[in-house]
């Protein structure tokens, strides 16, 4: 649940509970029923919606509301706790009350104006880069993203949980910045003059703890569907847009002219700095006694097919991949 909450994974958790009259309710007790536990209050801080069903005729309402909230806006987990007597109750499906969605009202005219302004800033830059996170994947904005990087050759970096968003062999790919990342990519970030983060919340693992120095020479712009991330980020932003990543990319693409490419010197710099500071060093490949983990992952990547699935644990296996 905590991972789904932090990584914005839409998910529905349904748990069984003791009979409603055997729950602690508002008594302040720790337990009444056999093996009872107040799971709802425990998961409230890491879910978008958590409820114990007290009326069997409201089951449709709770299920529909949970599904809507799980997938609406920034996705996340929801939890429905169903007592045993509610599970056993007879209901008339035709009479069940449903949930009426209330979608957020967006001023698209104002939003589009902001996006066009970002496009104008990009056109004035000489050393631009994009930093793309899982928000792009969640919004299914890959189509517009790929069009942008293919047509305009803008160097782009990925966050760890968006590593499979676009192939790492792409000519404009510059790696992953951050504390556990690529040194060359960090140099690129620090030398950019236009830094656009889309669908990534810019945690300390990316910016470092002295976040005031992150991309210090760049106009820093952040696009995120969660306004709280925009307000509470540790990076001083020049522009911030609360917006779905797919909508932003689609509108951003429309705002760009047919021809625009970053400076050739900048593209050459990005290429050379990554060559100068590779992840897999030559000495890694010449180890005799043991297999170097970085060399192993690099070799494994060469033989994996596009549809192969790789599951990693934390620690070295996670960082290495």
Task: Name every feature range the model reports, one short phrase each.
Residues 43, 118, 252, 266-273, ...:
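Generic structural signal of hydrophobic/aromatic residues within well-ordered alpha-helices
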Residues 1-259, 299, 303-309:
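N-terminal alpha/beta PP-like core and its mobile active-site loop of ThDP/TPP-dependent enzymes
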Residues 97-114, 261-291:
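Long, charged amphipathic helices and adjacent flexible linkers at domain junctions
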Residues 79-81, 133, 264-269, 313-314:
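Short coil/turn segments at secondary-structure boundaries
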Residues 271-321:
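Active-site diphosphate/adenylate-binding microenvironment
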């Amino acid at each position: 649940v905590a991972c789904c909450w932090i990584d914005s994974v839409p998910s529905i958790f349904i748990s069984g509970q003791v009979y409603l009259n055997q729950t602690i309710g508002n008594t302040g007790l720790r337990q009444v029923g056999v093996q009872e536990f107040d799971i709802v209050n425990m998961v409230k801080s890491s879910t978008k919606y958590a409820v114990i069903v007290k009326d069997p005729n409201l089951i449709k309402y709770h299920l529909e509301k949970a599904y809507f909230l799980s997938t609406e806006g920034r996705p996340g987990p929801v939890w429905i706790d169903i007592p045993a007597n509610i599970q056993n109750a007879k209901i008339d499906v035709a009479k069940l009350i449903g949930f009426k969605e209330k979608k957020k009202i967006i001023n698209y005219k104002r939003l589009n104006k902001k996006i066009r302004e970002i496009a104008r800033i990009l056109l004035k830059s000489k050393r631009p880069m994009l930093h793309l996170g899982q928000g792009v994947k969640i919004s299914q904005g890959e189509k517009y993203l790929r069009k942008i990087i293919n047509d305009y050759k803008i160097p782009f970096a990925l966050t760890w949980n968006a590593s499979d968003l676009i192939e790492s062999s792409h000519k404009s790919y510059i790696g992953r910045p951050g504390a556990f990342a690529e040194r060359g990519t960090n140099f690129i970030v620090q030398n950019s003059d236009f830094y656009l983060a889309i669908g990534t919340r810019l945690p300390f693992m990316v910016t470092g703890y002295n976040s005031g120095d992150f991309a210090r020479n760049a106009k820093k712009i952040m696009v995120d569907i969660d306004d709280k991330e925009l307000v509470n980020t540790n990076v001083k932003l020049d522009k911030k847009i609360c917006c779905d990543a797919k909508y932003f990319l689609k509108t951003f693409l429309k705002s760009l002219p047919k021809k625009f490419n970053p400076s050739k010197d900048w593209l050459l710099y990005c290429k050379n700095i990554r060559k100068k500071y590779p992840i897999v060093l030559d000495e890694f490949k010449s180890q005799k006694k043991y297999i170097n983990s970085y060399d192993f992952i690099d070799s494994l990547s060469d033989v994996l097919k596009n549809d192969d699935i790789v599951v990693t644990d934390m620690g070295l296996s996670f960082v290495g991949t």
